[in-house]
């Protein structure tokens, strides 16, 4: 059997059914797979992927395999793995997979090491952990790598920092920055799946509660809109004036976190930064305040400080930990401060991941074809790929659009037409 470390191979049949279910909602990726099967653009290419091991990721892996790639996959978050999906990838599809839901940090990094043991020529990241390891403990692999792709905002931030410092050793495509990714996955996917995770973990009623959303990027906008749609009173906190202004114009209250802390019933961090909720806020929180994160790494809520401040802590439900502070107020942290939409729920719906993962597949193809001549920089997804994915998605939805007439094209190309 293919090399692997998954929790329970007996779950494979169940996982396959779920993968097939997700695939039905991923028509763009299915079309990419059909072409890949015929053209074999990834034939013999070793791809190492560190992604959330979900049914949607499985459909991406099958697409890459159909294109001829040799694959090794590990989880990009200790709590995001779907164990039945991981089992199916190994037993049903013979894809080397290293992922356990709830794995500790040691196992998490052992799994990354296992993927790097395949000596990938293309890396595929969600958070830049593979690339970080290659530039750290595994510099010996740099010569093998043609280039990489990065799925999420947090990873792109890390990679742009590496580029600025002149240490990025190969080109990387920022899949996150494609319009067909961040305008849909980040906003509609994160918005829906974050609320889904909160409700699955807590079974609370959001209507009438005050939800504080930290960060008003695409992910924060989605969370705020969905919370408002369920009847919550939404407060937004921001550090960037343009986004704060957008939040105000969208009808939300905007204020500093120091003012929001005593008002909120539920707090959702979606910033990609550290210590968004920290000791300055913990003492001001209401009794029963719920804290969760949807911004990738588990650093947005300062859990070390919260734990030190607590006189007692216990797990009260799956994915819900209670901290009792000095004056007796109870604070609840969901999913260990990790991505709540993947810790307590199933992540984004397949229909939105269809576009994100089509970007991944086509960016990998582009990197194989062009990566050896690209500078050691972070690149955006080529516009023609972005537009083709949008066209394919519209077609799969039965939506037709207009085209410019010859006269309209000439008008737009001319500078002589005025009032």
Task: Place the predicted regions along the sequence by residue.
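Rossmann-fold NAD(P) dinucleotide-binding segment
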Residues: 31-34, 65, 119, 131-132, ...
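Glycine/serine-rich phosphate-binding loop and adjoining beta1-alpha1 elements at the start
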Residues: 2-42, 75-81, 86-209
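Short internal beta-strands
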Residues: 69-82, 235-237
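ADP-ribose/adenylate-binding Rossmann-like module
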Residues: 75, 123-127, 139-154, 273, ...
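Adenosine-phosphate binding glycine-rich loop
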Residues: 2, 11-27, 42-46, 54, ...
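Short acidic, glycine/serine/threonine-rich loops at helix termini
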Residues: 60, 84-86, 110-111, 132-139, ...
């Amino acid at each position: 059997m293919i090399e692997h470390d998954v929790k329970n191979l007996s779950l494979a049949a169940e996982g396959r059914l779920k993968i097939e279910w997700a695939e039905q909602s991923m028509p763009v990726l299915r079309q990419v797979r059909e072409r890949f099967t015929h053209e074999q653009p990834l034939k013999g290419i070793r791809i190492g992927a560190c992604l959330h091991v979900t049914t949607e990721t499985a459909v991406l892996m099958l697409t890459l395999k159909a294109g001829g790639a040799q694959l090794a996959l590990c989880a990009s978050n200790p709590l995001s793995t779907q164990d039945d999906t991981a089992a199916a990838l190994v037993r049903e599809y013979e894809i080397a997979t290293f992922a356990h839901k709830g794995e500790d940090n040691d196992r998490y990094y052992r799994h990354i090491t296992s993927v790097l043991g395949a000596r990938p020529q293309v890396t595929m990241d969600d958070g830049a952990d593979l690339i970080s390891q290659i530039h750290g403990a595994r510099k010996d692999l740099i010569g093998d790598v043609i280039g990489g792709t990065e799925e999420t905002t947090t990873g792109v931030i890390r990679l742009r920092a590496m580029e600025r410092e002149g240490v990025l050793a190969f080109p990387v495509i920022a899949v996150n920055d494609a319009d067909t990714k961040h305008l849909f996955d980040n906003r509609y996917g994160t918005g829906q799946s974050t609320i889904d995770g909160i409700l699955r973990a807590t079974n609370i009623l959001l209507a009438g509660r005050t939800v504080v959303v930290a960060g008003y990027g695409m992910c924060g906008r989605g969370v705020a809109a969905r919370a408002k749609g369920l009847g919550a009173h939404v407060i937004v906190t921001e550090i960037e004036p343009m986004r704060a202004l957008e939040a105000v114009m969208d009808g939300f209250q905007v204020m500093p976190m120091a003012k929001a802390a005593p008002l909120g019933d539920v707090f959702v961090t979606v910033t990609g930064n550290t210590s968004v909720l920290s000791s300055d806020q913990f003492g001001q929180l209401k009794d029963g305040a719920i804290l969760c994160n949807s911004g990738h790494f588990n650093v947005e809520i300062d859990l070390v400080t919260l734990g030190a401040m607590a006189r007692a802590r216990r797990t009260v439900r799956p994915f819900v930990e209670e901290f009792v502070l000095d004056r007796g107020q109870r604070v609840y942290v969901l999913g260990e401060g990790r991505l709540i939409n993947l810790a307590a729920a199933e992540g984004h719906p397949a229909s939105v991941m269809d576009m994100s993962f089509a970007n991944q597949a086509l960016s990998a193809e582009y990197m194989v074809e062009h990566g050896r001549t690209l500078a050691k920089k972070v690149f955006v997804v080529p516009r023609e790929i972005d537009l083709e994915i949008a066209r394919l998605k519209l077609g799969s939805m039965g939506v037709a659009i207009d085209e410019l007439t010859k006269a309209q094209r000439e008008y737009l190309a001319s500078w002589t037409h005025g009032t």
